[in-house]
A protein has these predicted regions:
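Short secondary-structure capping/turn segments at boundaries of alpha-helices and beta-strands
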Residues: 21-24, 43-45
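A short beta-sheet element
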Residues: 38-105, 114-117, 122-126
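A common structural junction motif
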Residues: 107-111, 148
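Short, flexible active-site-proximal loops enriched in glycine and acidic residues
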Residues: 97, 110-117, 132-142
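Generic structural signal for secondary-structure transition and capping sites
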Residues: 16-17, 42, 109
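Residues that form generic nucleotide/phosphate-binding pockets
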Residues: 11-14, 103, 112
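Non-catalytic DNA-recognition/assembly elements of restriction-modification systems
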Residues: 1-20, 26-38, 128-140, 144-152
Length: 152
């Protein structure tokens, strides 16, 4: 299978500048129906959303970046809010979003993580992650198998 090597920044739009963290106190005042995401998933529900669509969230910090007890990337869709502990990604025409999800969760990215007490995947380091990508048609074929297996 022929692949091309890209840095993540070449195949994705990073939407981190749209993140707005809310303190626990602020979230209590703003309870609602929209999911509020942190590094590892939904941590609350709030009354408004910042994003509407399908995105890939990649954990920015936390122990799980080293222990990998859970996936560090997750696909989210619909209307939601994200705090400043998860990177927000949309892919371009070179890469399917769900393909990147599987790829990131199966890669060793330890070389891009800094911090010993509090592991962190900075935006600058995340943009440098090297990815081997096949063409879109091949990605679609691989995804059809992976998604079928995941549904079982």
């Amino acid at each position: 299978m022929e692949t091309n090597t890209y840095c993540l920044s070449e195949i994705a739009e990073i939407c981190d500048s749209k993140r707005i963290p809310l303190s626990a106190m602020e979230r209590v005042k703003r309870q609602g129906r929209y999911r509020y995401y942190g590094a590892q998933g939904v941590i609350d529900y709030v009354d408004y959303y910042l994003f509407d669509g399908e995105y890939l969230l990649i954990a920015e910090d936390g122990e799980n970046l080293k222990s990998l007890k859970q996936n560090i990337a997750q696909v989210v869709s619909g209307r939601f809010w994200v705090n400043n502990h998860a990177h927000i990604i949309q892919t371009n025409s070179k890469c399917r979003l769900r393909y990147l999800y599987y790829l990131i969760n199966s890669m060793d990215i330890s070389g891009y993580i800094t911090g010993s007490a509090q592991p962190k995947l900075s935006q600058a380091n995340m943009k440098k992650i090297e990815l081997e990508l096949p063409d879109i048609l091949t990605q679609d074929k691989i995804l059809s198998v992976l998604c079928t297996v995941d549904k079982k």
